[in-house]
């Protein structure tokens, strides 16, 4: 079956469907890592990508954005000069009532009978001004980090903006 376009799952139409205990066969999340880069060092600058509208972000879109941001950061900044973190998790299970197409589909298809649907993926439900991705880095890499996060934001279904904050670093060690 063909995967449906992401715009079909973008809106928060119903309440969250997360109880996997009662579901059979929920596909696993495609997100491989939630933290990348230099995890041991503390950085003075925090740059976050926050969404401007409430929406559902599919796990495939989160993974695509993660790959885009991480690759750009590795090329332009280097692994030792940043800490990249995904701040949301795709808990919401997406369902789809599969429809048969082609010759003889009318004999095979059930139509709207038992139309609850099967689990086809997961999504993160986000609210306005919620941070989705965060990069911690040094002062000299702010512009390159902003560029990387902007590229990752193009993969999300909601418009997004960048928020830059200074973090006090503890140097007493």
From Swiss-Prot:
InterPro entries: Ribosomal_uL16 (IPR047873), Ribosomal_uL16_arc (IPR022981), Ribosomal_uL16_CS_euk_arc (IPR018255), Ribosomal_uL16_dom (IPR016180), Ribosomal_uL16_euk_arch (IPR001197), Ribosomal_uL16_sf (IPR036920)
Gene3D superfamilies on file: Ribosomal protein L10e/L16
Taxonomy, superkingdom: Archaea
A biological-process GO annotation: translation
Any GO molecular function: structural constituent of ribosome
The keyword Oxidoreductase is annotated on this UniProt entry: no
Gene Ontology cellular-component annotations: ribonucleoprotein complex; ribosome
Pfam families named among the record's database cross-references: Ribosomal_L16 (PF00252)
UniProt keyword annotations, A-Z: Ribonucleoprotein, Ribosomal protein
Family the UniProt entry places it in: Belongs to the universal ribosomal protein uL16 family.
Protein name per UniProt: Large ribosomal subunit protein uL16
